[in-house]
């Protein structure tokens, strides 16, 4: 299955880099401490095709956006639409300049926890 990249700063001709960014384990953004500053080195926003079982016993295929990024030797990942939207706004502003993000989040009006990010302007 081909990977459909939406946005990335990796060399998409490098198969090892593609594997590193799209396969294997990554730390979940949701588990990071709020207020933590994370320097971003490489990132990849891509579309992943998944299957899920339905109640009638059949399966259906769906697509979801996945964001992964690296900081040092660690890879982080999320499917949070809120986080992805904020992260991509930062990427657009920063273009090719180095940057770090600060992990933020809170609780929505309906009581669900969410994770987000903002640009670390002190980086």
Predicted regions and their residues:
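Glycine-centered tight beta-turn/hairpin loop motif at sheet-sheet or coil-to-beta transitions
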Residues: 70-74
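GIY-YIG-like beta-to-alpha core
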Residues: 76-87
């Amino acid at each position: 299955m081909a990977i459909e990249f939406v946005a990335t700063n990796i060399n998409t001709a490098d198969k090892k880099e593609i594997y590193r960014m799209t396969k294997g384990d990554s730390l979940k953004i949701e588990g990071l401490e709020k207020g933590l500053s994370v320097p971003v080195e490489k990132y990849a926003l891509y579309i992943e095709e998944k299957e899920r079982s339905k109640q009638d016993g059949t399966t259906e295929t769906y697509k979801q956006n996945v964001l992964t990024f690296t900081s040092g030797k660690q890879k982080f990942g999320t499917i949070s639409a809120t986080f992805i939207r904020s992260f991509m706004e930062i990427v657009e502003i920063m273009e090719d300049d180095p940057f770090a993000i600060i992990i933020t989040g809170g609780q929505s009006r309906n009581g669900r926890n969410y994770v987000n990010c903002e640009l670390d302007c002190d980086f």
